[in-house]
Amino acid sequence: MEACPHIRYAFQNDKLLLQQASVGRLTLVNKTTILLRPMKTTTVDLGLYARPPEGHGLMLWGSTSRPVTSHVGIIDPGYTGELRLILQNQRRYNSTLRPSELKIHLAAFRYATPQMEEDKGPINHPQYPGDVGLDVSLPKDLALFPHQTVSVTLTVPPPSIPHHRPTIFGRSGLAMQGILVKPCRWRRGGVDVSLTNFSDQTVFLNKYRRFCQLVYLHKHHLTSFYSPHSDAGVLGPRSLFRWASCTFEEVPSLAMGDSGLSEALEGRQGRGFGSSGQ
């Protein structure tokens, strides 16, 4: 029987509780109150460092019953920095996450990257070599008013990869500005990418700007049937995300600055939030 691949991680944070690190998913829970101001981005420093197994990426997301939306982050293999969760307040007044009201999840997935000699329409090569997702640029100028949701239609079919499904995810750089992209499947007939501006300012995005990323998830990770190893909070109830079967191995030396030791990886290293540069 083939052994499960290992996700190496280090964790140290007095404000979060490591609730579970079972096969496939690591879960943290807040031990202290988190205040989210209206129309302001909130970042939660997790004190968590992680490296996916070969051929895998990592996905980071939050879940709560409170009126708070989490950015779903794609963690690239070359990212060596601390993981942080980006949260947006859905209301126009303060929201409070009391202890145990926020769960933070980290899980692995298998992916592939299409071979493209040149950019194809809005689909571009990633900024850093080895990144999980391809860059997707805006086909037109766009203005988003505060608390406005708009859709961007992309009609060009993405390159196909057998046994993999093209899926849209947001970028952490835009999420830090208050713009969240709703993850969704990119099908042959095109895709409508939904963007919501949670900030208090009108945000102008120029044509050709990178505004989301295209990730080819292995078809195993997309299911319409619920199981203990799936989550409806990532892609929605009609297409559940089922994480890869991996085990978690604690490696304290992964913590940047913990012992002065960090992995000398070329490329992304500590730039960005693990999903995209700012």
Curated annotation (Swiss-Prot):
GO terms for biological process: dUTP metabolic process. Keywords: Disulfide bond, Hydrolase, Magnesium, Metal-binding, Nucleotide metabolism. Disulfide bonds join 4-246. It catalyses: dUTP + H2O = dUMP + diphosphate + H(+). Its EC number is 3.6.1.23. The keyword Repeat does not apply. It comes from the Viruses. GO terms for molecular function: dUTP diphosphatase activity; metal ion binding. Pfam families: dUTPase. Substrate binds at residues 76, 84, 171-173, 273-274. InterPro entries: dUTPase-like, dUTPase-like_sf, dUTPase_trimeric, HSV_DUT. SUPFAM superfamilies: dUTPase-like. Its cofactor is Mg(2+). The keyword Hydrolase applies. HAMAP family: HSV_DUT. Involved in nucleotide metabolism: produces dUMP, the immediate precursor of thymidine nucleotides and decreases the intracellular concentration of dUTP to avoid uracil incorporation into viral DNA. Monomer. Belongs to the dUTPase family. This is Deoxyuridine 5'-triphosphate nucleotidohydrolase. The gene is DUT.
